[in-house]
UniProtKB/Swiss-Prot annotation:
The active site is at residues 136, 280. Its EC number is 1.2.1.11. Disulfide bonds: none annotated. SUPFAM superfamilies: Glyceraldehyde-3-phosphate dehydrogenase-like, C-terminal domain, NAD(P)-binding Rossmann-fold domains. It comes from the Bacteria. It comes from Bordetella pertussis (strain Tohama I / ATCC BAA-589 / NCTC 13251). This is Aspartate-semialdehyde dehydrogenase.
Length: 376
């Protein structure tokens, strides 16, 4: 018998990717989907969901209460408004959420089952009912480096990120493309003239970038032809919230730190927004607990998850396989630039790329739903 599952936020960017992945993997054969909407209750369910009833009101607590499992990609404001009311009304079901709202709550598990399935299983056994997707950058990094973390080889790690526009949302992606288009328009006559001086073209681009009329309401400053070395809120101590998440969430995913009675792994670095569309990249400096030969490190990484792909540390392989353009739309997490650093044999350099909308958002939720279907 199929389980009824409530789906909220299925039309947004993350939700749309989640729905496509569920269709690709035939997950809908395992559930009876109940589609909710925050703005179109009573409307038609998606045409591809055969037999699904009309859209339910996503704020109707009584309707939500009937479901043993709810999956939401509606965002943090929705979670903040609806979740407490739902639990307050006595609902005991499983809540699977893409938003960060509940991520660090004591009664929530951050889900990334290829890396932390034992943590998830233990939580289900003790009655945990809240399962939340992790920060996109953290999840993609762990999918690549699980082999090192799960073999307890990482003493500390520094991560310098190159994060895509998609991390901000759909409107941020649109704004980036709009900026690129306007910058091109500003110098197109010069670009079309082979005799035009490149410095004249450069001055034209800069003038347009610095023009206050360039659309920048979402990023706050131009991102096209630029970068922004700050993501998310200012915590007031020189650290951004995005940077704080690296250590906090990695350790929670792995079941480490004070809450688990084990030492946390120190992780810190800087988070930077770049003009890529939907893949987050990271340059990593890793202090290993012991000197491990590079070929053994490569084997451990390749065996860590089936999606981790070691890229040979050559120029040709790197530029072909270790880029956002190569990775977008795939579940592969390539890990490359692997080499021992000059600081010593325990210091490892690495670079990894992951699709922010797949392992960084939708895929852990989809897989958690599969796990929950055996438990609900």
């Amino acid at each position: 018998m199929t389980q009824a599952v409530g789906l909220v936020g299925w039309r947004g960017m993350v939700g749309s990717v989640l729905m496509q992945r569920m269709r690709d993997e035939n997950d809908f054969a395992l559930i009876e989907p109940v589609f909710f909407s925050t703005s179109n209750a009573g409307g038609a369910a998606p045409a591809w969901a055969e037999g699904a009833g009309s859209l339910q009101n996503a704020y109707d607590i009584d309707a939500l209460k009937k479901l043993p499992i709810i999956v939401t990609a509606q965002g943090g404001d929705y979670t903040s408004e609806v979740y407490p009311k739902l639990r307050g009304a006595g609902w005991q079901g499983i809540w699977i959420d893409a938003a960060s709202t509940l991520r660090m709550a004591d009664d929530a598990i951050i889900v990334l089952d290829p890396v932390n399935r034992p943590v998830i299983d233990a939580a289900l056994k003790r009655g945990v009912r809240n399962f939340v997707g992790g920060n996109c950058t953290v999840s993609c990094m762990l999918m690549g480096l699980a082999g090192l973390f799960n073999n307890d080889l990482v003493e500390w790690m520094s991560s310098m990120t190159y994060q895509a526009a998609s991390g901000g949302g759909a409107q941020h992606m649109r704004e980036l493309l709009t900026q690129f288009g306007l910058l091109n328009q500003a110098v197109k006559p010069l670009l079309d003239d082979p005799a035009a001086a490149i410095l004249d073209i450069d001055r034209g681009v800069l003038a347009r970038q610095q023009d206050p009329s360039l659309p920048q309401e979402h990023f706050g400053v131009p991102l096209g032809g630029n970068l922004i070395p700050w993501i998310d809120k200012d915590l007031g101590d020189g650290m951004s919230r995005e940077e704080w998440k690296a250590e906090a969430e990695t350790n929670k995913i792995l079941g480490r730190g004070a809450a688990f009675g084990t030492p946390a792994t120190p992780i810190d670095g800087l988070c930077v927004r770049i003009g890529a569309m939907r893949c987050h990249s990271q340059a990593l400096t890793i202090k290993l607990k012991r000197d491990v030969p590079l070929d053994e490190i490569e084997d451990l990484i390749a065996a860590g998850t089936q999606w981790a792909k070691v890229v040979p540390n050559t120029k040709e392989d790197t530029v072909k396989a270790l880029t956002p353009v190569a990775v977008t739309g795939t579940l592969d997490i390539p890990v490359g630039r692997l080499r021992k650093l000059s600081m010593g044999l325990q210091y490892l350099g690495a670079f990894t790329v992951g699709d922010q909308l797949l392992w960084g958002a939708a895929e852990p939720l989809r897989r958690m739903l599969r796990i929950a279907l055996a438990e609900a």
